[in-house]
């Protein structure tokens, strides 16, 4: 073999063993659409009684995807509002054959402001004072 043929073979090997340049892949546009998130602010907290086994069901009923929309209501109550319960707040339940009229009053003789209350409660629960176990019962540490 002469010099030129051996050089040709080496050049062929280099060109065949060198990787071919692959153009970079184009990024696909994400076609996912973001569904709007429904945020529910509770300005009129109410007290409900339920057993631990029904608690999750109650929460989902009140705040879940199929929850009824609540009418807009003010976030501040004055002392005048507390003395007059409206008809929708009345709860007439028969108890052992008797009918009792009970109503929920947001706070007695005080002005209620939702942002101030929620800030205070978040600090209270983040302190670790209460412990919620996997069964959903709340117990103090």
From Swiss-Prot:
Biased composition (Polar residues): 1-20
Induction section of the entry: By infection with the necrotrophic fungal pathogen B.cinerea.
Compartments reported by the entry: Plastid, Chloroplast; Nucleus
Gene Ontology cellular component terms for the protein in this record: chloroplast; nucleus
Pfam families reported for this sequence: VQ
Residue span of region Disordered: 1-36
Placement of sequence motif Bipartite nuclear localization signal: 13-29
Entry keyword set: Chloroplast, Nucleus, Plastid, Transit peptide
Alphabetized InterPro entries for the sequence: SIB1/2 (IPR039335), VQ (IPR008889)
Biased composition range(s): Basic residues: 24-36
GO-annotated biological processes: positive regulation of DNA-binding transcription factor activity
The keyword Ribosomal protein belongs to this UniProt entry's keyword annotation: no
Positions occupied by motif VQ: 55-64
Range annotated as the organelle transit peptide: 1-38
Disruption outcome: No visible phenotype under normal growth conditions, but mutant plants have increased susceptibility to the necrotrophic fungal pathogen B.cinerea.
Main location: plastid
Function, as annotated: Functions as activator of WRKY33 in plant defense against necrotrophic pathogens by stimulating the DNA-binding activity of WRKY33.
Complexes and interactors: Interacts with sigma factors in chloroplast. Interacts with WRKY33 in the nucleus.
Protein name: Sigma factor binding protein 2, chloroplastic
Taxonomic source organism: Arabidopsis thaliana (Mouse-ear cress)
Encoding gene per record: SIB2
